[in-house]
Amino acid sequence: EDTDNSQYIYLPPTKDAVRNFAQTDNTSYSWFAPAGINRGGVDCVRAHYVTKLADEDALYEGRINPVKTFARDGVKIWGQKNLQINESQLNRISVRRLLLRIRKLIAIACLGLIFEPNDNTTKQSFLTAVNPILDNVRANRGISDYRVEVNDTVESRERRELPCKIYIKPVN
């Protein structure tokens, strides 16, 4: 509020969206949506415009997360879409952040395997490093299931590669 001019100053909720990302990381996990009643708070006296259901639907279909006013809970960010056009789980902020987090954790855990002999011990070390990470994410409501496939062939060993595929099923 601008007390000198006795009027409200309206700021975009972008500042709150960024804060909600950080707060979500600090209070839960990055794969939780930084939106909704629990994690979607907008720090304001009131919204500049109170949306109606038709407004919210139109915004969400256009990949814009609406800001919704609740009588009891205040103003909240009410959506978690990103700008991906295709309709899939990948157009959700929480799923994108889940993938980024898993990728980072696995990369860090597997650094010690680089330049190791390409044998069954290294393959087992990889699985020993990756499975607990994915088990932890599953235990903390990020994924409901996963599968790790290591395609260890003679050709890949000769190229000093350990190709693998990790399949995950994000929690909806």
Task: Describe each model-derived feature in a short phrase.
Residues 1-172:
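Structured, hydrophobic secondary-structure cores that serve as assembly/anchoring elements
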